[in-house]
Amino acid sequence: MTANKTAKIQFYEGTDEPVVPEIRLTRSKDGTTGQALFLFEKPQALSSITDGEITGMRMIDSEGEILTKEVKVKFVDGEPIYLEAVYIWKNSSDFDRFMRFANSYAKSNGLGYSEKK
């Protein structure tokens, strides 16, 4: 079930999440700390074909794995619709590592990057 992508996201080990999230970044003024908010609409991880408990989100690329355990499910009319994950970085090297993953993930999924002015 795992596709051969350079960068991927998994909620269950060995199973890539095919739904591409909206990703929003915020950083402190000095740029050393911040967070990335991932918002997945109707992800496969919440579908009836998946079994098990989501305990985190793995961001996997050629350098290895970044893990966040901050994952929440948002319900609409009693149905799980959104999966929200937050990755927090606490120093510039963590941010640089995250950005390398983000660039690789964007290339793997044909995405672009835009900055709010």
UniProtKB/Swiss-Prot annotation:
Compartment(s) where it occurs, according to its Swiss-Prot or TrEMBL record: Cellular thylakoid membrane
InterPro entries for the chain: Psb28_c1_sf, PSII_Psb28_class-1
GO biological process: photosynthesis
Signal peptide residues on this chain, from the entry's feature table: none
Assigned keywords, A-Z: Membrane, Photosynthesis, Photosystem II, Thylakoid
Pfam families associated with the record: Psb28 (PF03912)
GO CC list: photosystem II oxygen evolving complex; plasma membrane-derived thylakoid membrane
Thylakoid as UniProt keyword: yes
Keyword Cytoplasm: no
HAMAP family xrefs: PSII_Psb28
Assembly and binders: Part of the photosystem II complex.
PANTHER family noted in UniProt: PHOTOSYSTEM II REACTION CENTER PSB28 PROTEIN, CHLOROPLASTIC (PTHR34963:SF2), PTHR34963
Protein name, entry field: Photosystem II reaction center Psb28 protein
Species for this entry: Prochlorococcus marinus (strain MIT 9215)
Gene that encodes the chain: psb28
